[in-house]
Amino acid sequence: MFEFLKNLMTNNESVSANETNFLHRILNTDIKDEPKSQEDEIIFGCGCFWGAEKCFWKLPGVITTSVGYAGGEKDNPTYYEVCSGITGHAEVVKVIWNVNEIDISDLLKMFWECHNPTQKNRQGNDMGTQYRSTIYYKNDINKDKIYSSKEAYQKELYK
């Protein structure tokens, strides 16, 4: 249907954050903290990152979220560079969650249902490659769950 899944994250890469203030204003968590042993992280691109981020706040077990750009060719691009389509970045939300409180399947359900993955490079009135549907993962266990959820949701779309 569409290319949405790439393993681009490493331990040294994450969504860029403001270098002077790391406290999440809504969740009151440090957005620069690395996941602890009972936590995991994933990055979702599902349209405008502000609206997408808000969807994940209401899920119990989500520790923190942060927004930024991923999947592009330039370090620390500006909003205008990303909107130009030249850098190849997507607007994304990094989600860190407690694996003992919420399963990745619940996060994937929110991902599929909080946007329309069938609209290529747009969400509603927002148009551009930065609004594409994408998932960045860190391990093969999550990769398998992501692909399984994609197949399940694709079957529903074809009914």
Which residue ranges define each predicted feature?
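Flexible coil/turn and secondary-structure edge motifs
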Residues: 1-159
